[in-house]
Amino acid sequence: MIRSIVRGFGAALPKRVMTNSEIEGVVETSDEWIVQRTGIRQRYIAGEGETTASLGEAAARAALDNAGLTPADIDLIILATSTPDNTFPATAVNIQNRLGMTHGFAFDMQAVCSGFVYAVATADLYIRGGMAKRVLVIGAETFSRILDWKDRTTCVLFGDGAGALVIEAGEGEGTSSDRGILTSQLRSDGSHKDKLYVDGGPSTTGTVGHLRMEGREVFKHAVGMITDVIEQAFEATGTTADDLDWLVPHQANKRIIDGSAKKLNIDPEKVVITVDKHGNTSAASIPLALAVAASDGRIKKGDLVMLEAMGGGFTWGAVLLRW
């Protein structure tokens, strides 16, 4: 059977690092308060000339280099983002052009922090359906540009960046020992749409708007929703937490990550944490974390890896793959 296998990975971050101490000069907060509640110590902030498209392009080129491929080898680009360069055309098309591609097709996917999980699952469907052999899946965000820098409950949380995977068609036996994507579990519940949102848009206010969040409500639902889809991914593949080599969660908040791992009895040593350095980069957080852990040798060929995320909507999901 056809499996969708990870061929390469890459990441890109803005030049500017903003520490918690710098944020102390913007809003009434402290490094101690931020670290204690979120685990975040710094984040990267896009500067002049740095956009979702430029960061996405850089991550894409890094992933292609890692895979030993060129843009000519790619059939499809899927960009997960909530901060596109323009309302339209899709920022994925902009990245396609930046890569010098005039073949194939490209589109954006918007599921906020769950975007990369949704995009990987979608790439898998295109590959297994025979519409693409190689897909460039990118998560890229410039959340700093939709933050209300007077709102200390949100502006301390988010950062900018991009990560990418090259996923290609391969052969498998149809067992959990196969390399590639083994299962995807995706969910959404729009009754929670007002708990994490941006208060503007072209069809309503005609403005970009700012991010608004009911933090306690998000936290209240996060662990349960995340553990539910992870358990369903294990059930679908006949695997367990003991079989897992790495959990690569959406890097939103260390307390949510720790709570999910504890509820699932996953060893903390198996959890990839980058929220301390990157903050919450929304759809970029999982591919950034994958790039860090694969680059430093933690994630190796044959490892069983769980990706999971929850975002505005609410949206949430998990992908279980063998690296």
UniProtKB/Swiss-Prot annotation:
CDD domains: KAS_III. It is found in: Cytoplasm. Pfam families: ACP_syn_III, ACP_syn_III_C. GO terms for cellular component: cytoplasm. The keyword Acyltransferase applies. GO terms for molecular function: 3-oxoacyl-[acyl-carrier-protein] synthase activity; beta-ketoacyl-acyl-carrier-protein synthase III activity. One of its GO terms (biological process) is fatty acid biosynthetic process. Its main location: cytoplasm. Pathway: Lipid metabolism; fatty acid biosynthesis. Keywords: Acyltransferase, Cytoplasm, Fatty acid biosynthesis, Fatty acid metabolism, Lipid biosynthesis, Lipid metabolism, Multifunctional enzyme, Transferase. The keyword Cytoplasm applies. Residues 251-255 are annotated as: ACP-binding. It comes from the Bacteria. Catalyzes the condensation reaction of fatty acid synthesis by the addition to an acyl acceptor of two carbons from malonyl-ACP. Catalyzes the first condensation reaction which initiates fatty acid synthesis and may therefore play a role in governing the total rate of fatty acid production. Possesses both acetoacetyl-ACP synthase and acetyl transacylase activities. Its substrate specificity determines the biosynthesis of branched-chain and/or straight-chain of fatty acids. Belongs to the thiolase-like superfamily. FabH family. HAMAP family: FabH. The last Arg residue of the ACP-binding site is essential for the weak association between ACP/AcpP and FabH. This is Beta-ketoacyl-[acyl-carrier-protein] synthase III. The gene is fabH.
